[in-house]
Each structure stands twice: as C-alpha cells, then as structure tokens.
Amino acid sequence: METILNTQFDQLQKAIEGIKEAKSKGQSTDEARIATTLMFVALKHANREVKHKIKAGRDKLHLEKCKVDLSRLQLQNLLYEVSHLKKEIVRCQKFKSRDTSLELLSEAEYSSELPDMPNDAEELSSHKQHLHRLDCELRLRKALDKQYSALLSSKQELLQDNLSHAQRYVSFAPALRTLQSATKPLHDALQLSLDVEWKLSAVVKYLPKPLYVLFIVLQSLQRVSEEQSFTAEVVGYESEAQMQELLKEKKCSTLNYRQTKKESGDREKIADKNNLDDSLAPHPLHICLTIGAAGSNQLVLQIRYFDFIKCATVWGQLNCSRNANGQGDTNFVHHLLRHLYPNDLGNELPIPGIQYELRSSDLTAEECVRYLKAKDYGKPFCWLQSMCSIATVNSSMLYKHELNLNKNNKEIIDRIARRLNSWQRLSQQIRGLTFKDIDLYSLQENIYPAGLSCSLVQWTAITHEELHSQISDALNSSSADKGITYNSYRAVIVRGSAKMECFIRIPSNYPLEMPLWILNVHWNGCLTAQNNSAIKMMEFWTNSLQPKHLEPNDCILYAQLFRTIYSFDIFLETEGSMQNTIEYNKEKPYISAFAKRSRSRPYKYIKKGSVYAFKQ
C-alpha cells in the first residue's frame, strides 16, 4: 500500500508540475486539471484502504495484548503454586509423625506375627509400606487389647472362684478337727495310728510350694505301691529355711520402701546389685528322689527349686553297687533325663512370662540355664515342672498345667526306671563285648549255636571322625539332630582270610532310637553298601531289628551282632561258591543261594518246630 501511495503522489506531483508549466507557457490546463482531479479520487480510495488496514492492525494488536495478559496471569498463578508447594515441602520435611515415639515390632516379629504385604508390595513406595505396617500393627494391638480384656475378666473370675474355695477350706478345717477328736476313741479301740502315719517331719512345712506338692504326692505313691521302687526324702536344715524366710520378708519390705519412694517423685535410680549367685540361689531344702531297689544300682535325683526363676531343676547321679558301667557311656544319666520326652532337652526356662521378669533384672534365660548347668544344679525340664504342678510353656508355645499329679508322677517315675534299666543293660553289653568276658555260644540271642563260624576278635571305642569317614547311605539318611549325641564303636569279625569291620553308632536317646551298624567287608577287595548290593542288604537286615522282634530279656546289641555274624557267614558261603578256589563250604541250611531276580542272599532265619533254615 505504501508503494501505491508513493506512486500516486509522484504522479500527482508530476501532473501539478505539468499544469504549472502549461500555465506559465499560457497553454490550456483544463484537461490536465480534470486528470489531476481524478487522481485525487484514487488517492482518496487508497486512503480509505489504509484506514481499514490500520483499524484491522489495531484490532489484531489488541487481541495479541489480551493473549499476553492471559499468559502473564497464568505465569503468576504457576509461580504462586510453586511457592505454595515449596512451603508444603518445607512443612512436610519439618513434620514428625506420632508413630516415631511408638515402639514398633522388629522385622523378624513383623514377618512372623503380622500378615504379609500385598502382591504389589514391590511397586509401593516406602511411605505406603510404612502406612500398611502401621495399619497391621493397629489391628494387632486391638486384637491383643481384646485378648487382654478377656484374660483380665477370666482372671477376675478365677480369683473369685479361688476366694470361694478358700472360704470353704477355712470352714472345713474346724469341722475336720472336730471330727478327728470325736473319732479318736474309735481309733484307739481299733488300734489305728492314722495320726502317726500322716504326721510329716517338721522340716517339710518349710519346703516351697512346688516341692511340697511333689513330696506329698511321692509320699502317697510310696504308700500305695506294692514294691518299694523309689524313695523320697527332704534334704537340708530347718534353721537355714527359717533364715531364708526372714531374709525374704526383709527383702519384700525393702522393695516396698523403694516403690514408695519412686511413687513419691524420687527420680534417683536404685539398681539391684545382686549377681547371679544371689539371684539364682536355690532353696535351702531340696528333695532327694532315689529310684531303684536297695542293693542294686540306684538313680539319685536331686530336685531343687529356685524362687527367682519360679521353676525346679533336677540333677542326677548313679550310685553303683559295683562298677557295672565300665566302658559304657559315663554320661548316660544326663542322656536319660534329657531324652525322657521328645523336644524336652532342658535348654530353656519353660515358665510363662519369665523372659519379661528376667529382662527387668538385665538377665536372659540362656544365662540362667548356663549358670544352673555350671553349678551342677541340673536342668529345668518340662516333665519335672509337671511333677511339681508348675504351669509350663514349651518351645512350641503350648501351655500345660498338669493337675492329675498321681498318675503323671507315677508314669514319669516308671519311664525313668525303664530307661535306666535299658541303659544299664546296654552298658553291660558294651562292657562284655569290650573285655570279651561273655561266651557268644551260650547267649540266648544266639538263634543257631551250631553254625557260628565267624569270631569276634575286637570291640573298641572310636572317635566320631572315624565313624563319619565311612560312606554309607544309612549314615546319611539318619534323622536330623535334635540334641542327640552319639557314641561310636568298631567291631572286627574274622573268618579265614575274610575280615568284616563293623562301625556301630549308639544314640543318646536309646532306646527311642536303635544302634546303627555300618559294614565293610575286606575280602577280594573292599566291599561296602555303596558298591555291593549284598552288603547293603546285610546292613538293612541288621539295622531293621527292633525290640518288638526280640524274645523277652533279649539284648538288642547281642541280637544285632548275631544277625551280622550269620549274615557274614552266608555272604561268604554264597559268594565263595562262585570263586575259582572254594574257600568257604556251605554250612548253613538254606534252599537257594540267590533269589531269581533280585539276587538277594538268604539272610532271614525261619524256624517252624524242629525245622529251621535261612531264606531270602
């Protein structure tokens, strides 16, 4: 448009100059003036177009201005939001959640007691995981609070029940004394001495409650039993028990005084300086339980009670009339008590809530158990607590409170007596085999005396390393170790040029678990259960012997030995028949040396009437 206007202005200027020049020359200027006037019309039209374009430009400029103002307003809003978010970030950084002052569960307790995280736990942030954990712990605490309320109400009911029973017992005592005095003439007429029989020693009343209950039950069992299989007596001095009662009362008064000072606002910390010797001092009186008849080997159990840990312990020792143990296990009394019941090894304090009480004294249950063992006080077995009517919680968190004490204590004493008899017989067998003071041909376990061709030349004790150096499936597939220890022995059986080494492992929980035999035959090479199926079957046949397969009064170790000897004889006789030079002739009565398919040897002995033979 600017170019058009400039062109029109130039043309108009030229036309005016032409008119001026024509006018100066005296020529006619009408046509030129008309043409020039028409140029003004075009100029006017161009001027109008310029005005329209200026107006359109102004409108466009106003529109762009509005857009710029809107953008600036949005920018201000964004800047305000940024400043607000920064303030929120600072506020969040300074924020402290109230759960920081709470004592939350550890990771191990959380994984065991609370439910697992959802499947998309990996995608959750740490904050959301923490919120989930807090929610789970809240539910757990609510459940524990309900359980606490239920237990509290149950405790109140039991207290009311105990109070009513105590009132009944208090009212029953005068009536019983009246009845006793009224029936005394009848006792004298019938020459009864009931008051003398039931009169206890003066020292018994100073026993702690659990030992008192145990002693009374043992006395009742001793009176009703036909044979005197055990005796119980109280060991200790009455003066020491009285002195401990006085010290206990003084200590209680001191603790009450300290508690009063603490409640009155004294913030001084009073620490108990008693060490383990003072805290774990046993009661001066204890029970000595002797199991076994007089004149024979007797098991003496010393049962003590510890008021600090609220449980009883037992320490056992064997009183031998003669050295009957010999090369047997010298710690078999410890093994007998330790494996009397499954999963009751005595390595923990089975008292409910004792860990929390020990924690207040900066002690642990493990420290207490180690101290009791070091001082030869014994171990706190669960079966012993049940004999004393003490409530227990085992490692599986099972609560038990035995109330039928007569039946329970009689069963435990009978079990100890049976285990003691089994261990003594096993020790006698080991001694006889070690010192060779037995006649294998005359033993009742010898099922075929005429055919004993092999001879036992050695029986010695070996180390565990020597036993574990043997490679055997029977040794690898043995049960998992649950506090079980083993004694190992080596027996050598010889026949001609053949020799068999027997490695015997006797577990500490015998007779719950039978002795294990591992066999190695040295004849034309070294034959074991790993490289010879006949030796593997021989091992199985020896180890499959159980007490139910024996005759009454048979010894398990002798029976296993004879099974091994006869199996070795049959192996040599059947294997020797295939050799070029026959060294061992057939002496045992068997029908066939090998089975048709399995090629098994006739190790099994059968007898029907006067007919006996070995078969597969």
Swiss-Prot record:
<keyword id="KW-0472">Membrane</keyword>
<dbReference type="GO" id="GO:0043021">
    <property type="term" value="F:ribonucleoprotein complex binding"/>
</dbReference>
<dbReference type="GO" id="GO:0000445">
    <property type="term" value="C:THO complex part of transcription export complex"/>
</dbReference>
<protein>
    <recommendedName>
        <fullName>THO complex subunit 5</fullName>
    </recommendedName>
</protein>
<dbReference type="GO" id="GO:0032991">
    <property type="term" value="C:protein-containing complex"/>
</dbReference>
<dbReference type="GO" id="GO:0000346">
    <property type="term" value="C:transcription export complex"/>
</dbReference>
<dbReference type="GO" id="GO:0003729">
    <property type="term" value="F:mRNA binding"/>
</dbReference>
<dbReference type="GO" id="GO:0000347">
    <property type="term" value="C:THO complex"/>
</dbReference>
<dbReference type="InterPro" id="IPR019163">
    <property type="entry name" value="THO_Thoc5"/>
</dbReference>
<comment type="subunit">
    <text>Component of the THO complex, composed of at least e(y)2, HPR1, THO2, THOC5, THOC6 and THOC7. Interacts with piwi; the interaction might be partly RNA-mediated. Interacts with CG9890.</text>
</comment>
<keyword id="KW-0963">Cytoplasm</keyword>
<dbReference type="GO" id="GO:0005737">
    <property type="term" value="C:cytoplasm"/>
</dbReference>
<keyword id="KW-0539">Nucleus</keyword>
<dbReference type="GO" id="GO:0031965">
    <property type="term" value="C:nuclear membrane"/>
</dbReference>
<comment type="function">
    <text>The THO complex is required for cell proliferation and for proper export of heat-shock mRNAs under heat stress.</text>
</comment>
<dbReference type="Pfam" id="PF09766">
    <property type="entry name" value="FmiP_Thoc5"/>
</dbReference>
<dbReference type="GO" id="GO:0005634">
    <property type="term" value="C:nucleus"/>
</dbReference>
<dbReference type="GO" id="GO:0007140">
    <property type="term" value="P:male meiotic nuclear division"/>
</dbReference>
<dbReference type="GO" id="GO:0031990">
    <property type="term" value="P:mRNA export from nucleus in response to heat stress"/>
</dbReference>
<dbReference type="GO" id="GO:0006406">
    <property type="term" value="P:mRNA export from nucleus"/>
</dbReference>
<feature type="modified residue" description="Phosphotyrosine">
    <location>
        <position position="237"/>
    </location>
</feature>
<comment type="similarity">
    <text>Belongs to the THOC5 family.</text>
</comment>
<keyword id="KW-0597">Phosphoprotein</keyword>
<dbReference type="InterPro" id="IPR038765">
    <property type="entry name" value="Papain-like_cys_pep_sf"/>
</dbReference>
